[in-house]
From Swiss-Prot:
Keywords: Cytoplasm, Lyase, Pyruvate, Ubiquinone biosynthesis. PANTHER family: CHORISMATE PYRUVATE-LYASE. Its main location: cytoplasm. This is Probable chorismate pyruvate-lyase. The gene is ubiC. Substrate binds at residues 82, 120, 165. Its EC number is 4.1.3.40. Pfam families: Chor_lyase. GO terms for molecular function: chorismate lyase activity.
């Protein structure tokens, strides 16, 4: 994992998350992206020839390593930590960090622990019953600039996972207007 990617992932843990009604959106275009209720992967795929995943981490972390706000959203249990970079036509667009509780991994249509380089959203939103709640957004301030981020809890067949996404500078979220 290169240094900027490590910095991006670390910054996702430091975001001051806000509810949509409290967040100051830079523009309507970004608001539409951040409030997306469907699959971000599918949406990104519409803006490139090829959407690829660079898998950075995919392993179990203990409940005590979760931040308190993460534990509140998921319950206190060990989770599969999946960290990725989503790339559109080989250009990094989104850094993603997903926590999937062990109980969410069992009795599912799909083996989420074996996603590999398949975008998680494509699998999750193919399930029979998917909902999103606890949507939050925020800003990440880094030497490379100011980036939008969002976090939400996805329910796949009534079992939760927590997904955080950092939109990098070349992401389509910034296409209409630069932040």
């Amino acid at each position: 994992m290169n240094q900027p990617t490590s910095l991006y992932l670390a910054s996702l843990l430091e975001v001051e998350w806000q509810k949509p009604e409290e967040f100051e959106f830079p523009n309507e275009f970004a608001k539409h992206w951040l409030e997306e209720q469907g699959s971000l992967s599918r949406r990104l795929k519409q803006h490139c020839q090829e959407l690829t995943v660079e898998l950075l981490q995919n392993h179990i972390v203990t409940a005590k390593t979760l931040k308190s706000d993460e534990s509140q959203l998921l319950s206190e249990q060990d989770c599969l930590l999946r960290e990725v970079v989503l790339c559109g036509d080989d250009c990094p667009w989104v850094v993603g960090r997903t926590l999937i509780p062990r109980t969410t991994l069992v009795d599912q249509q799909y083996d989420l622990a074996q996603q590999g380089d398949i975008p998680l959203g494509l699998t999750v939103f193919s399930a029979d019953n998917v909902e999103r709640d606890s949507l939050q957004m925020g800003w990440v301030h880094l030497p490379q600039g100011r980036f939008l981020a969002r976090r939400s809890r996805l329910w796949m067949n009534h079992k939760p996972m927590l997904v955080a996404e950092l939109f990098l500078s070349n992401s389509p979220i910034y296409a209409k207007e630069r932040v």
